[in-house]
């Protein structure tokens, strides 16, 4: 067992952090052949609660968990880490759109980007969960000029998993039957859950699910508004499902993608599909021998092109807003 990874988790005492850490320590992201150090970052008032989480982690006696660092100092948290999972963010409350969070979270992610730039290992990769995650990732990336831009990612896997779940339910099939379910653009209510390119048992989803009205209206709106629906029902935002999607994402970014599938992650655009270079945009991706690449040969009908434009326009607006605030 030669492999070892140091992982920073921000917002470690929060609900997503609590749902994430035990699975992370048990090998569910990096594999059963990789030992883990956890660097846990929290704001000062949450440190006592975080110490309780650390006690529980100790009490699990995970064979793969080597060391834990508990701190409120980003420089300590990101020191020599190979992965930074940026989970902590000001919470989204009922009735709140992600744009309202931009200013609130901007200074947090600018500071964390700088701390990662100055303290992390040379091979660090950054994965942003805290919302609005695309633009929080953009802010962190622009405040870490020494780290290659292709090491920054934001999570749209929760949307992908939600979409897979809904297609499986509607088609009456098991979840593994659904593949190539792509999320395009922003992790927000403008995202485009692209059922046109999804497959169910190897056939186009549109051939298996004949209810076009459901696909065009109910399905898309359910996925776009699922986060808000969970908040309304639960009184708090998605936590366990978000943690699960983060683990899925890290696994997919590290391991070779099966030949008949892809996964969605937001990353730094290089002009693919007409997206502005430098925007953090969700694309269909594959990993081959540790190298992540965007699948570029997908064609969109008029409906898909319009949906891509809507989410791209929103991401441009968010970028312009944080530029005006001096955050990038």
Swiss-Prot record:
Keyword NAD: yes
Identification of the protein by name: Malate dehydrogenase
Pfam families linked: Ldh_1_C (PF02866), Ldh_1_N (PF00056)
Native organism: Coxiella burnetii (strain RSA 493 / Nine Mile phase I)
PANTHER family for the chain: MALATE DEHYDROGENASE (PTHR23382)
A molecular function (GO) term: L-malate dehydrogenase (NAD+) activity
Residues involved in substrate binding: 92, 98, 131, 162
Function: Catalyzes the reversible oxidation of malate to oxaloacetate.
Family: Belongs to the LDH/MDH superfamily. MDH type 2 family.
Reactions catalysed according to its record: (S)-malate + NAD(+) = oxaloacetate + NADH + H(+)
Keywords attached to this entry: NAD, Oxidoreductase, Tricarboxylic acid cycle
CDD domains in the record: MDH_chloroplast-like (cd01338)
Family matches, as InterPro entries: L-lactate/malate_DH, Lactate/malate_DH_C, Lactate/malate_DH_N, Lactate_DH/Glyco_Ohase_4_C, Malate_DH_AS, Malate_DH_type2, NAD(P)-bd_dom_sf
Active site residues of this protein: 187 (proton acceptor)
């Amino acid at each position: 067992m030669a492999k070892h990874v140091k992982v920073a988790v921000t917002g470690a005492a929060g609900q997503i952090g609590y749902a994430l850490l035990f699975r992370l320590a048990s090998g569910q992201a990096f594999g059963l052949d990789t030992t883990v150090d956890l660097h846990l970052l929290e704001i000062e008032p949450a440190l006592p609660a975080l110490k309780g989480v650390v006690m529980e982690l100790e009490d699990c006696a995970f064979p793969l968990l080597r060391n834990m660092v508990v701190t409120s100092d980003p420089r300590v948290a990101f020191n020599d880490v190979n992965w930074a999972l940026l989970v902590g963010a000001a919470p989204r409350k009922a009735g709140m759109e992600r744009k309202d969070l931009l200013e609130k979270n901007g200074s947090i992610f600018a500071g964390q980007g700088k701390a990662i730039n100055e303290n992390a290992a040379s091979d660090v990769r950054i994965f942003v969960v805290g919302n609005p995650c695309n633009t929080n990732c953009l802010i962190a990336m622009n405040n870490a000029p020494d780290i290659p831009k292709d090491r920054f990612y934001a999570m749209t896997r929760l949307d992908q998993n939600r979409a897979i779940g809904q297609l499986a339910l509607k088609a009456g099939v098991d979840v593994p039957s659904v593949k190539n379910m792509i999320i395009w653009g922003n992790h927000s209510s403008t995202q485009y859950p692209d059922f046109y390119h999804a497959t169910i048992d190897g056939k186009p989803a549109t051939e298996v699910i004949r209810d076009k009205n459901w696909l065009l209206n109910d399905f898309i709106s359910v996925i776009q508004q699922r986060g808000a629906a969970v908040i309304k029902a639960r009184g708090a935002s998605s936590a366990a499902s978000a943690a699960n999607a983060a683990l899925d994402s890290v696994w997919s970014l590290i391991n070779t993608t099966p030949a008949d599938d892809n996964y969605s992650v937001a990353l730094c655009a290089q002009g693919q599909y007409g997206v502005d270079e430098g925007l953090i945009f969700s694309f269909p991706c594959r990993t081959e021998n540790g190298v992540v690449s965007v699948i570029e040969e997908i064609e969109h009908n008029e409906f898909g092109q319009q949906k891509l434009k809507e989410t791209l326009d929103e991401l441009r607006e968010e970028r312009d807003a944080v530029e005006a605030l001096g955050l990038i």
